[in-house]
Amino acid sequence: MKILVINGPNLNLLGNREPETYGRTTLATIEAELRRQASQAGVEIEFFQSNHEGALIDCLHAARGRVDAAVINPGALGHYSIALRDALAAVDYPAVEVHLSNIYRREEFRHHTVTAAVVAGQISGFGPLSYRLGLEAAIELARRRREAPPDGGSNG
């Protein structure tokens, strides 16, 4: 089983950018924790980060037929990128959307994500724990899909 973890714009600056909102944990630290979690679960994990919408879409497309599920933090793109939303809708694997901050306790424009309607679920507001919970959910979704009957059982 393989899980893809995708991070969007500005997440490469975690630990330095707005620490009062996003905390001081770096993306490298989050990735190391997810590697440990995946290893303990016997799951392969792959990471990708880009500040460019097209690169994120290309990554989602390239993962078709290669991964069993994804965890995505689209960053600000989640609020307005119809192209990213459509890419998530087009892939053949479930995705879990995560956000470090509670987007519903922030500015009004952050209360809605266009991507939420096409992912299996959304986790926000738990800091780095959002990623660990997202990975746990992605693993469970992938397991359910593998165990589903071939005649159209639910994929999560």
From Swiss-Prot:
* Reaction it catalyzes: 3-dehydroquinate = 3-dehydroshikimate + H2O
Give the annotated active site: Y22 (proton acceptor), H99 (proton donor)
Q: InterPro entries, from UniProt?
A: DHquinase_II (IPR001874), DHquinase_II_CS (IPR018509), DHquinase_II_sf (IPR036441)
* EC class (word): lyase
Arranged from A to Z, the UniProt key words for this protein are: Amino-acid biosynthesis, Aromatic amino acid biosynthesis, Lyase
The pathway this protein participates in, as annotated, is:
Metabolic intermediate biosynthesis; chorismate biosynthesis; chorismate from D-erythrose 4-phosphate and phosphoenolpyruvate: step 3/7
Out of the domains of life, which is the source?
Bacteria
One GO biological process term: amino acid biosynthetic process
Binding positions for substrate per the UniProt entry: N73, H79, D86, L100, S101, R110
An example molecular function term from Gene Ontology annotations? 3-dehydroquinate dehydratase activity
**Which Enzyme Commission numbers does its entry carry?**
4.2.1.10
Keyword Amino-acid biosynthesis: yes or no? yes
Recorded hits in NCBIfam families, A to Z, give: aroQ, PRK05395.1-2, PRK05395.1-3, PRK05395.1-4
**Alphabetical list of PANTHER family matching this protein:** CATABOLIC 3-DEHYDROQUINASE
Family annotation (HAMAP family): AroQ
Please state which protein family the record places this protein in.
Belongs to the type-II 3-dehydroquinase family.
The job of this chain, per UniProt, is described as:
Catalyzes a trans-dehydration via an enolate intermediate.
Task: From the Swiss-Prot or TrEMBL record, give the protein name.
Answer: 3-dehydroquinate dehydratase
Question: Species name for this entry?
Answer: Moorella thermoacetica (strain ATCC 39073 / JCM 9320)
Report which gene this protein is encoded by.
Answer: aroQ
